[in-house]
Amino acid sequence: MIKNIVFDFGGVIVDIDRDKAVQAFIKLGLADADTRLDKYHQTGIFQELEEGKLSADEFRKQLGDLCGRELTMEETKQAWLGFFNEVDLRKLDYILGLRKSYHVYLLSNTNPFVMSWACSPEFSSEGKPLNDYCDKLYLSYQLGHTKPAPEIFDFMIKDSHVIPSETLFVDDGSSNIHIGKELGFETFQPENGADWRQELTVILNS
């Protein structure tokens, strides 16, 4: 029986628009943004930021070096937010409803620029931060690992005391779903942009 649900952030709770993000970073001056940005797993300084190896300010400085000019923290943040489309309140309300019957967690490859927005009242039109929708957030840059590394899953399992066989892992990334299955989680892989609420309800009721 499912007792816990672990959601991914980008591509599940909030839809991702990689092309918009690429254009935002090109506008900053990063001419090769298209080769540096990935929907599922970053590389270079982008990966180092998500793994917590670079602080937000260190990333800003190194990105500025690549762009050939000094960038502000706000400019850098807005470029990162280019990844995300408008937050769908229907999904957020659905997740709130799930919390009446399940423990709800977030496991995300992310960074402090994105989370400074997501964990603020600006996140939703109702003025609620992401924290209000989950029991706990497990964020790659705070934990020093990114999915699909087993270490980030292991930390979440030990910290939350979830039993994988009693936990549904919801993620749009194939490699993340693969490791989730290997670790014993029940899994569900919706497509980025999909309204997965009805399908998830069927899974939980089966």
Swiss-Prot record:
It comes from the Bacteria. InterPro entries: HAD-like_sf (IPR036412), HAD-SF_hydro_IA (IPR006439), HAD_sf (IPR023214), PGP-like_dom2 (IPR023198). This is D-ribitol-5-phosphate phosphatase. It comes from Bacteroides thetaiotaomicron (strain ATCC 29148 / DSM 2079 / JCM 5827 / CCUG 10774 / NCTC 10582 / VPI-5482 / E50). Its cofactor is Mg(2+). The keyword Magnesium applies. Mg(2+) binds at residues 8, 172. Gene3D superfamilies: HAD superfamily/HAD-like, Putative phosphatase, domain 2. Belongs to the HAD-like hydrolase superfamily. It is an enzyme of class 3 (hydrolase). GO terms for molecular function: 5-amino-6-(5-phosphoribitylamino)uracil phosphatase activity; metal ion binding; ribitol-5-phosphatase activity. GO terms for biological process: dephosphorylation; riboflavin biosynthetic process. The active site is at 8 (nucleophile).
